[in-house]
A protein has these predicted regions:
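Helix-breaking motifs and short loop linkers at transmembrane-helix boundaries and internal kinks
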Residues: 37, 69, 90-95, 158, ...
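Conserved MFS/SLC helix-loop-helix module at the cytosolic interface between two early adjacent transmembrane helices
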Residues: 55-94
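Structural signature of the two symmetry-related core transmembrane helices
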Residues: 72-87, 273-288, 367
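Cytoplasmic helix-loop-helix junction between adjacent transmembrane helices
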Residues: 100-139
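Helix-loop-helix hairpin linking two adjacent transmembrane segments in secondary transporters
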Residues: 130-180
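Transmembrane alpha-helices of Major Facilitator/SLC transporters
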Residues: 247-270, 284
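C-terminal transmembrane helical hairpin of 12-TM major facilitator-type secondary transporters
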Residues: 272-316
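A late C-terminal transmembrane helix in Major Facilitator Superfamily
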Residues: 311-313, 318-370, 380
């Protein structure tokens, strides 16, 4: 059996791998488009198939590990993730790509809440706050690692649409085997079938923070969804003759900046981190909005850095405010509720952006998207400023 000390980094690596797999297709969309001849709208549908499937899993199975145990739930989800990677590697068209994204989303939704709760369970009592920090940084670190590896393979590998998925399949299979060697930390209890009824289980003590943080979280993840789905297309619009890797580097820049912000924000009060991060989304969105007009990649990447920094700070502050007051048996549900809100914010606006791109062109869609994010951000800042600091 793995020791408690070894189990913590294992579950952190699971979250990194899950989010690496979620971002791996981003640099490949241009290759898929060139081979299968589909539109920007189809790109956002493929992207959102993953996010909506993940939402369905969180709404139904987000608390399943509280009832059945972390270990069996996580083992099954990782095996399903490996199946999804095999489906990606063998996909021959858009329908197969969407199907693989759906399987991946379901598996990730189940695994994310279970692994995140396990991190809290395995936290060293002598190092409080480490699990919340890990829950904040592993998703963005995973997305950064996934998009960077995929971008490198696009540039240098002979079969980039297969290689990255076969590597991830191997990782998930190894992690599934390692999870079986960990100690079970949840105490299985009855009610597993009832827990599958769609619903959101936010800890009562965390509900005021959820209401306060919602606009900022929605704005941050909506901006992240844009960069993930249409970031490469925007880079090609601005610099049509740039390297194929440029589109992937846009999303890598976002996630790398977010990861650094999570680390920096851990020393700030949680509410301060969330407020400052929300404020940074405004200049990030404005620079992104302005980038197509002078055809400036510098403006795009500067906006991406600001947006990523805001994204990371918002995520770090929000997770600390939400998870700190939750009881141990409320953690998985509260974490799942946070991800439900986040992925709704990430997927629905991205689909609308794809529709707007088809109707009016990418440049106008970028403008409308940026304005929407700014309005949400201002609403979040106003709500935070009005609430007492004790909330």
């Amino acid at each position: 059996m793995l020791s408690r000390r070894s189990a913590f980094p294992l579950h952190a690596s699971v979250l990194v791998a899950l989010l690496a797999a979620s971002s791996a297709p981003t640099p490949l969309y241009a290759l898929y488009q060139a081979e299968w001849h589909f539109s920007a709208m189809t790109v956002t549908v493929v992207f959102s198939a993953y996010a909506l499937a993940l939402l369905g899993a969180l709404l139904t199975a987000g608390t399943l590990s509280d009832h059945l145990g972390r270990r069996p739930v996580l083992f099954g989800a990782l095996l399903a993730e490996a199946v999804a990677m095999a489906a990606f590697a063998t996909a021959q068209g858009v329908a197969a790509l969407i199907a693989a994204r759906v399987v991946q989303g379901l598996a990730t939704g189940v695994a994310t809440s279970a692994a995140g709760a396990a991190l809290l369970d395995f936290e060293d009592p002598g190092r409080p706050g480490r699990a919340t920090l890990a829950n904040g940084i592993t998703p963005v670190a995973g997305m950064a690692a996934g998009v960077l590896a995929s971008t490198a393979l696009v540039q240098y590998a002979p079969a980039p649409t297969r290689t990255v998925y076969l590597l991830l399949l191997t990782v998930f299979a190894a992690q599934a085997a390692a999870v079986l060697l960990t100690t079970e930390t949840a105490h299985p209890r009855s009610g597993a079938w009832r827990s599958l009824r769609p619903g959101i289980a936010v800890a009562p003590a965390s509900r005021p923070a959820m209401k306060l943080l919602a606009p900022g979280v929605v704005a941050a993840w909506a901006l992240g969804g844009f960069y993930s789905s249409l970031g490469p297309s925007l880079a090609r619009l601005i610099a049509p003759h740039a390297s194929r890797a440029t589109g992937g580097l846009v999303f890598f820049t976002l996630t790398a900046a977010a990861g650094l912000a999570v680390l920096a924000a851990r020393t700030l009060p949680a509410r301060t981190a969330s407020f400052a991060g929300t404020a940074l989304l405004i200049p990030g969105a404005l620079l992104t909005l302005s980038a197509p007009h002078p055809h400036s990649l510098l403006a795009l990447f500067a906006g991406t850095v600001l947006a990523g920094t805001g994204f990371g700070a918002v995520s770090q502050g929000a997770l600390r405010l939400l998870l700190s007051p939750a009881a141990p048996d409320e953690r998985a549900g509260t974490l799942a509720a946070y991800y439900v809100l986040s992925y709704l914010a990430m997927s629905i606006p991205a689909v609308l952006a794809g529709l707007l791109t088809n109707l009016y062109g990418l440049q106008r869609a970028v403008s409308l998207y940026a304005v929407t994010v700014i309005v949400l951000t201002l609403a979040g800042l106003a709500r935070t400023a009005r609430q007492p600091s004790s909330v």
